């Protein structure tokens, strides 16, 4: 099984630890960055993870930022992604078994590493349990999606990053 993983600069070390854990369990890890602690933007990495999952390049995805809120919101904008921000086993299992979630999001500064590993492993091993009710619910979720061709462009963030590099944005 191939697992896509991505993070922002705040939790690079957490992502690397999760990546090593997944590899130790025999999973193929597709690491979409970031790879260091240089200030960057979580939507870039959420988008990359989501696109890898939806395209079939990866079977499932894991997104991590400081609280998990930002990157999870970003990955959920990719049409076809159903991601859940979780901090506990019950939420992760519900997301996979009832909503057929294909990405899981974490706050790397919120959820401890060992718990995160346990939750990820349970999420991967859980199976979607289709019922007429949850099939209808998933169809309603998918109906909300709208595709924006502009965002599908690989250069979507280029202008933003060029402005950042020129110092036009500040924290």
UniProtKB/Swiss-Prot annotation:
It comes from the Bacteria. GO terms for biological process: D-allose catabolic process; galactose catabolic process; lactose catabolic process via tagatose-6-phosphate; pentose-phosphate shunt, non-oxidative branch. Induction: By lactose. The operon consists of lacABCDFEGX. The keyword Lipid metabolism does not apply. Its EC number is 5.3.1.26. Disulfide bonds: none annotated. It catalyses: aldehydo-D-galactose 6-phosphate = keto-D-tagatose 6-phosphate. The keyword Isomerase applies. GO terms for molecular function: galactose-6-phosphate isomerase activity; ribose-5-phosphate isomerase activity. It holds the Pfam family LacAB_rpiB. Pathway: Carbohydrate metabolism; D-galactose 6-phosphate degradation; D-tagatose 6-phosphate from D-galactose 6-phosphate: step 1/1. InterPro entries: LacB, RpiB_LacA_LacB, RpiB_LacA_LacB_sf. Keywords: Isomerase, Lactose metabolism, Plasmid. Belongs to the LacAB/RpiB family. Heteromultimeric protein consisting of LacA and LacB. This gene was sequenced from pMG820, a laboratory-derived deletion of the naturally occurring plasmid pLP712. This is Galactose-6-phosphate isomerase subunit LacB. It comes from Lactococcus lactis subsp. lactis.
């Amino acid at each position: 099984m191939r697992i896509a993983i991505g993070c922002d600069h705040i939790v690079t070390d957490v992502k690397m630890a999760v990546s090593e854990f997944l590899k130790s369990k025999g999973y193929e890890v597709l690491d979409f960055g970031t790879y260091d602690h240089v200030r960057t933007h979580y939507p870039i990495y959420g988008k990359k993870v989501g696109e890898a999952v939806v395209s079939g390049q990866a079977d499932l995805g894991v997104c991590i930022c400081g609280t998990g809120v930002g990157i999870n919101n970003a990955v959920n904008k990719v049409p076809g992604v159903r991601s859940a921000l979780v901090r506990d086993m019950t939420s992760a299992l519900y997301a996979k078994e009832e909503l057929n979630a294909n990405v899981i999001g974490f706050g790397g500064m919120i959820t401890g590493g060992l718990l995160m590993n346990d939750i990820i492993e349970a999420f991967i091993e859980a199976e979607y349990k289709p019922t007429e009710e949850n099939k209808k619910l998933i169809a309603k979720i998918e109906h909300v999606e709208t595709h924006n061709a502009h965002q599908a462009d690989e250069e979507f963030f280029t202008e933003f990053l060029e402005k950042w590099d020129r110092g036009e944005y500040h924290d």
